[in-house]
């Protein structure tokens, strides 16, 4: 088999029109789960990102990070922005089941979305970055793949060709304990209270935080998939870029994960951004500098179309 690099890098220099629609991709009882699809005009095939929003596993929805989705679509990348079950009502691994299904759903309907199965990646921000990476690393995990495609549908799995992460919570257990230490300090800030509560709501136990953990899975030597990945990180971000007091690794969490991922055979880049993150406040995606452009450029180098 040979591969042909898609002309996404050139698309970064120009924009295209796109269409937006909400579709129901999954239903739990009488509750539909929607995806907002941003689809470039033209014939394709286009790369596609299944987009996983942040919000400490409990908050936000498919509309929250629309600036990123709009930019991707305007530069020739299909954006499939998900709603999924909230950790406020459905604990781990419910959201992972929805996301795993969504990847398979997009593959099943690839021609309708002007893409192909081998052009599909995952993208996520904060807790969404954690979920995206965990689905990518464990595409065949029977817990995550528990929701079947419709009867008679062709078989598809949740393997992806790329993972794009923005300040992911890559180590839920480490972040939980980091927040608890911050709360126990002198004159603690407010952010640890809400972070701890949402960890508790979604994970229910430290054992689950350790098990559903991309960082610790690699350090345990778990056999996982390691598709090409990129981590974008803002400066001054004490919620995602900190030294884990329980680890002997000399650097912060981003550097630790990059080292582990490469040791496992994966290719990953770490990009620091000229933006400030403030604990307890949602990031302003209009002030992330050239992050979106860098994402498009990275996809142009890493998403390929198999031929033959």
Language model segments and positions:
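C-terminal catalytic histidine-bearing segment of alpha/beta-hydrolase fold enzymes
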Residues: 36, 230-242, 251, 255-308
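Short beta-strand element of the alpha/beta-hydrolase
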Residues: 45-55
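N-terminal cap/lid segment of alpha/beta-hydrolase-fold proteins
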Residues: 2-43
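The feature captures the conserved acid-bearing segment of alpha/beta-hydrolase catalytic domains
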Residues: 150-177, 201-244
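Primarily recognizes the serine-hydrolase "nucleophile elbow" in alpha/beta-hydrolase
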Residues: 104-181
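Alpha/beta-hydrolase active-site loop
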Residues: 90-111
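Mobile cap/lid helix-loop segments that gate and shape the active-site cleft of serine hydrolases
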Residues: 9-17, 144-149, 174-221
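Short amphipathic alpha-helix adjacent to the substrate-entry channel of hydrolases
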Residues: 63-81
């Amino acid at each position: 088999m040979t591969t042909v690099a898609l002309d996404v890098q050139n698309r970064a220099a120009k924009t295209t029109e796109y269409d937006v629609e909400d579709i129901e991709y999954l239903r739990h009882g009488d509750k539909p789960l929607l995806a907002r699809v941003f689809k470039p005009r033209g014939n394709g095939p286009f790369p596609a990102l299944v987009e996983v929003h942040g919000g400490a596993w409990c908050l936000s929805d498919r509309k929250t990070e629309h600036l990123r989705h709009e930019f991707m679509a305007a530069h020739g990348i299909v954006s499939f922005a998900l709603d999924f079950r909230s950790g406020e009502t459905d604990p781990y691994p419910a959201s992972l089941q929805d996301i795993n299904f969504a990847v398979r759903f997009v593959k099943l309907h690839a021609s309708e979305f002007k893409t192909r199965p081998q052009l599909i990646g995952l993208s996520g921000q904060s807790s969404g970055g954690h979920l995206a990476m965990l689905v990518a690393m464990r595409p065949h995990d029977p817990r995550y793949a528990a929701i079947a495609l419709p009867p008679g549908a062709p078989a598809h799995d949740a393997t992806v060709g790329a993972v794009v992460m923005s300040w992911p919570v890559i180590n839920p257990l480490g972040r939980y304990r980091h927040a608890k230490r911050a709360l126990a300090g002198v004159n603690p800030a407010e952010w640890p209270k809400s972070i701890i509560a949402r960890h508790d709501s979604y994970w229910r136990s430290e054992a689950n935080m350790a098990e559903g953990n991309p960082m610790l899975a690699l350090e345990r030597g778990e056999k996982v998939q390691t598709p090409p990945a990129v981590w974008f990180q803002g400066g001054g971000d004490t919620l995602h870029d900190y030294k884990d007091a329980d680890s002997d690794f000399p650097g912060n969490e981003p550097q630790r994960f990059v080292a582990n991922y490469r040791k496992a055979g994966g290719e990953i880049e770490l990009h620091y951004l000229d933006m400030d993150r403030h604990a307890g406040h949602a990031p302003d995606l209009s002030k992330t500098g050239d992050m979106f452009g860098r994402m498009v450029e990275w996809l142009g180098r890493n998403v390929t179309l198999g031929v033959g």
